[in-house]
Swiss-Prot record:
Inducing factors: Accumulates in pollen tube 4 hours after pollen germination.
Tissue specificity as recorded in UniProt: Expressed in pollen grains and pollen tube. Mostly expressed in mature pollen grains, and, to a lower extent, in inflorescences and siliques.
Transmembrane residue ranges: none
Biased composition, class Basic residues, residue ranges: 147-167
Biased composition (Low complexity): 202-212, 223-232, 341-368
Protein name, entry field: Transcription factor MYB120
Record field: compositional bias (Polar residues): 175-185, 396-410
A GO BP entry: pollen sperm cell differentiation
Amino acid sequence: MIMYGGGGAGKDGGSTNHLSDGGVILKKGPWTAAEDEILAAYVRENGEGNWNAVQKNTGLARCGKSCRLRWANHLRPNLKKGSFTGDEERLIIQLHAQLGNKWARMAAQLPGRTDNEIKNYWNTRLKRLLRQGLPLYPPDIIPNHQLHPHPHHQQQQQHNHHHHHHQQQQQHQQMYFQPQSSQRNTPSSSPLPSPTPANAKSSSSFTFHTTTANLLHPLSPHTPNTPSQLSSTPPPPPLSSPLCSPRNNQYPTLPLFALPRSQINNNNNGNFTFPRPPPLLQPPSSLFAKRYNNANTPLNCINRVSTAPFSPVSRDSYTSFLTLPYPSPTAQTATYHNTNNPYSSSPSFSLNPSSSSYPTSTSSPSFLHSHYTPSSTSFHTNPVYSMKQEQLPSNQIPQIDGFNNVNNFTDNERQNHNLNSSGAHRRSSSCSLLEDVFEEAEALASGGRGRPPKRRQLTASLPNHNNNTNNNDNFFSVSFGHYDSSDNLCSLQGKTKTTYNTSNLNYSSLQVKCKMFMIKTQI
């Protein structure tokens, strides 16, 4: 087939779509025997070289390149046919170990073999050895091109090594010279960090571990770690389980709830207490009361004092703040004085719930336990309240964290208390509820007539270490009472001329009291 126009060379140098200088159309495709004879006769007479003159001198419709390739690969007299011998194969392996893929230079070392034959042999051998998993070179032959790589490849490898080393140095500088302020202010999905108590154990604290590996640590989990990085840089901190806290506090841990230190020290098991905020409507604080079932001991009321939510009160201090829903005339500073009266023999405290008196220690329980000191001559269940300004009744809802009853029973009293606990609790609850109504009526009655309101004070006494057999030695006894402007104690029983029987509460007398003061209020 003869085609006009330029084209590439075909097999054995046969040109395609090509015209000679004289305008002769050149052939392409396989050579014929007549063409081989014309080419062989011309080379025997004129020798090898000047292949473009073959077409001019012989009229052969082949280009010079096609004539050269046909003579070198098929027509020359010293050409070897067939497969390679063992010596030739070993020589090819040695030459390839020294020269690499230099097929023409290898063919010059093998007389009678062409570069195309050597290339085909090596590629076939390479595929077979890779498929079988055998080494490419025998043990006695070491590739020279691997020991002495090409200068261009060596420079490229050195450039890649220096670039990788420079990236590592930048990562180290970002990690070790990053300001601490940026690490502390880095946002995260965990709560605000707060230090964990030093004596907290792994089973008694509920903490989350703050990890921002992608922000604080330059080596993120998605970045491949080289051996140099693994040896020179510390690994990123792992995520700790929410049920345990890390032993080494190198990174800030975040407690989910600010528990008191006493609870953390005492609770060594895995039980966790989650304090909940109290509901909006709660019964009066003096409703939670218990009494001793003893003939010589009056009703013992344990008054619950509420504080601001999640603001613990120091257990070792004898002064505290009270935030309860009853107004006081003015906010005064805390004073300590002793009132000599027949109703109380313990020192009294006048407390001020100022903002500066809020404690900040987190190592003490978050509620104050006020224990009533029984007396044979008087009975006081009036708690002491103090506020800076008056509030509406709808806003006077106490926020109570919790309460705790501190009772020092003897063996006989404990048995009597267990027998009469159900009935006495119901009666004392009703008594306390009516007492609160009675106090509110008294406050309204005194305020309407222009009488000065009574200043409520807290009377506290130091604990008696001789008679105290309980473990709660740190608590102190508190008795509540009313003090007017002249510091005279006004007892509730003195106003109504009513005495309480310690063995049986007179419920009807409390109803009469309530009705009397309700009538006074209406007047």
